Amino acid sequence: MNGHDSCVLVTGGFDPIHGGHIDYFQDAKLLSTYLIVGVNSDEWLRRKKGRPFMSWESRKRIIDQMNIVDYVIDFDDSDGSANDAIEQCLKDFDKVIFCNGGDRKEDNIPEYEKYKNNKRVEFKYSVGGGKTESSSELLNA
């Protein structure tokens, strides 16, 4: 998967994927030439929402077909973090730029404590602008 020194990593359930996610991907891609999308597992969604609306395979297939996306990974951290996705990227890249959407900050993401002193991990916030749509709200409308 490599050939690049750094990657930008975005993570989420993307269940279902919507326009706000596209903004998130496009904004993130401006930070590095290699965009990796970490898609939460079905088990993660069961713990968070009760059940997935779309299977991991379906979500992965849709995201994988987007020209802006270079690689899709799955991950499942029982603590609600994306630490597993970050670790997967650190195996192949010298630097990981971990992006967070508009509603996330260093004081409300579990990954910050683990990686705040790791010079190979850089945190970016408000990527993709403010939260304009919510998958949960779309499903409950």
Q: What are these model-derived regions, one by one?
A:
Residues M1-A141:
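Nucleotidyltransferase catalytic core that binds NTPs
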